[in-house]
From Swiss-Prot:
The keyword Transcription regulation applies. This is Protein SHORT-ROOT 1. Residues 190-253 are annotated as: Leucine repeat I (LRI). Transcription factor required for the asymmetric cell division involved in radial pattern formation in roots. Essential for both cell division and cell specification. It comes from Oryza sativa subsp. japonica. InterPro entries: TF_GRAS. Residues 56-68, 173-185 have a biased composition (Gly residues).
Length: 602
């Protein structure tokens, strides 16, 4: 059984006999485990500790931590938590799954389900100091002074108020809206959604006894190598635990460092190309945006004199330039006299704490290959990569010299899954960033964003603050919508990729990092706060832009693209019942809109 954490007793040796008796009782009740996997490797990370006080007085109380009042709990007992372990059926991890979540370590231990729990004394430095205190996981059923470090079998019994359905597989089309999912639970067969939402409610209510019970259940059922429900349980459970222990930013840095260590140009290229080959998730926005950019440039060329046109694209995206070869091919079909000079400035954004060495290596290789491809196509071309750390709103657009001293004939701004890199807050930073794009006076701005309402409050409200995103109500709203969105994403990967695939694993781990960011990091630090098309459309209109409808030729290109993929994908026009009416098109999976593409002009 894959597990996110293993709970290990930290009792004194004198209590060993009592622990073994309780462990035997626990094992007799734990007959529903799906079994242990035959291949695993150990991992390294800082061990976290659950505080357990036998005198705490109930599940609703509690001391410090992210939700528990900010007071340090009294030192009595701690459970240490083993870091995330990589397992992959019977395949060697170095053969099938290349990248790891953590590097190997000989200090971690793997305890199989049903084995006797090894007792250890915590080191002198085990009590957290200088960091946010960890939440107590107290149980009212534990007698004062009993002092055991294992869950009681009675405490871990199946909650009688939960009616879970394991009979049918998850379907992303049946999840309902974010609000209904967050309040009413999942549909038939969506056991992960039901358990995770109930666990999130318990976290928000500070019911530590029920949190402990539900986390144990999720831990037994979760696996990053199982079906969609097991993967959702695994990644969201990791995020919930990081939130409870106030270790979200640290966990995210560790995951990002592991990804950076195992990232190369070849692995990035394979993942991007395989994703485009099997799913239209990214290529949908590329085709729509390229069509709008090309048509706007050709309009400028037709109205200008015979002198050589110089076009410049400011590329604010995270797609590693996979969008641009088709645009270069389209420009190459023109006669030699009409072929314009094209410059692309790509801004590569990353969180302040994220490692960037691997991304810089990849972008250098991409730049060289882009320039070589442009020479083969006969298109005069210049490529520049700008690495930016932190909030995208802090990027100095004027310093990029996009007009090249006045030589640029037309400027286009391409925003693909990048606007969410501007952290929403009381200063209306996203509104201000849209206004800064308007000051560039571009010929066209293309916006491609994933369709999810992951901001904690109305981003346009004057009372919206960074702190407002960390209330219990805001957490539940974002958690429910995030569960809906990532459930649909995982479902599309499940039905598009083969069961064993390095590229699929890399994409799922990227989603896992996004889930940890969303669930465990403060709203003021999260880089995953997506918004809906209606919100982006209101913002673009307020900044002085007007929507540009995609031409019939571009729409035909998008439909032709979708016919290359399996059934379930479709294109939908923007509805007429909201402010996004007439602005862009949606990519839908099983009738659920997931990606929005649009074009705008000043």
């Amino acid at each position: 059984m894959d597990t996110l954490f293993r709970l290990v007793s930290l009792q004194a040796a004198s209590e060993q006999q009592q622990q073994q008796q309780q462990s035997a009782s626990y094992n007799s009740r734990s007959t529903t485990s799906s079994g242990s996997r035959s291949s695993s490797h150990q991992t390294n990370a800082s061990y976290s500790y659950y505080h357990h006080s036998s005198n705490s007085g109930g599940g609703g109380g509690g001391g410090g931590g992210y939700y528990y009042g900010g007071q340090q709990p009294p030192p009595s007992q701690y459970y240490y938590l083993e870091p995330y372990q990589e397992e992959c059926g019977n395949a060697p991890h170095h053969q099938l799954y290349m990248d790891e979540d953590f590097s190997s370590s000989s200090s971690s231990r793997h305890f199989h389900h049903g084995a006797r729990v090894q007792q250890q004394q915590p080191p002198a430095s085990s009590t957290p100091t200088g960091t946010a205190p960890t939440p107590p996981l107290s149980t009212s059923s534990t007698a004062a002074g009993a002092g055991h470090g294992l869950f009681e079998a009675a405490d871990l019994s199946f909650p009688p108020d939960l009616n879970l359905d394991f009979s049918s597989p998850a379907s992303s089309s049946g999840g309902g809206t974010a609000s209904s999912g967050a309040v009413g639970g999942g549909g038939g067969g969506r056991w992960a959604s039901q358990l995770l939402l109930e666990c999130a409610r318990s976290v928000a209510a500070r019911d530590s006894q029920r949190v402990q019970q539900l986390m144990w259940m999720l831990n037994e059922l979760a696996s990053p190598y199982g079906d969609v429900e097991q993967k959702l349980a695994s990644y969201f459970l990791q995020g919930l635990f990081a939130r409870l222990t106030a270790s979200g930013p640290r966990t995210l840095r560790t995951l990002a460092a592991a990804s950076d260590r195992n990232t190369s140009f070849d692995s990035t290229r394979r993942t991007a190309l395989r994703f485009q080959e099997l799913s239209p998730w990214s290529s949908f926005g590329h085709v729509a945006a390229n069509g709008a950019i090309l048509e706007s440039f050709l309009e400028v060329a037709a109205a200008a004199s015979s002198e050589t046109q110089r076009f410049h694209i400011l590329d604010l995206s995270n797609t590693f330039c996979t969008q641009w070869p088709t645009l270069l091919e389209a420009l190459a079909t023109r006669s030699a006299d009409e072929t314009p000079h094209l410059s692309i400035t790509t801004v590569v954004s990353a969180a302040p704490s994220a490692p960037t060495a691997a991304v810089q290596r990849v972008m250098r290789e991409i730049g060289q290959r882009m320039e070589k491809f442009a020479r083969l196509m006969g298109v005069p071309f210049r490529f520049r990569a700008v690495h930016h750390s932190g909030d995208l709103a802090e990027l100095d657009l004027d310093a990029l010299d996009l007009r090249e001293g006045g030589a640029t004939t037309a400027l286009a701004v391409n925003c693909v899954n990048s606007l969410r890199g501007v952290v929403p807050g009381r200063a209306r930073r996203r509104d201000a960033f849209a206004a800064s794009l308007r000051r560039l006076d571009p010929r066209v701005v293309t916006v491609v964003e994933e369709e999810a309402d992951l901001v904690a409050s109305d981003p346009d409200a004057s009372s919206a603050t960074e702190e407002g995103g960390d209330t219990e109500a805001a957490f539940l709203k974002v958690f429910g919508e995030g569960l809906r969105f990532f459930s649909a994403y995982m479902d599309s990967l499940e039905e598009s990729f083969p069961k064993t695939s390095n590229e699929r694993l890399a994409l799922e781990r990227g989603a896992g990092r996004a889930i940890v960011d969303l669930v465990s990091c403060p709203a003021s630090e999260s880089m995953e706060r997506r918004e809906t098309a209606a919100s982006w459309a209101r913002r673009m209109r307020s900044a002085g832009f007007s929507p540009v409808a995609f031409s019939e030729d571009v729409a035909d290109d998008v439909r032709s693209l979708l016919r290359r993929y399996r059934e379930g994908w479709s294109m939908r026009e923007a509805g007429t019942d909201d402010s996004a009416a007439g602005a862009g098109v949606f990519l839908a999976w099983k009738e659920q809109p997931l990606v929005w593409a649009s074009a705008w002009r000043p």
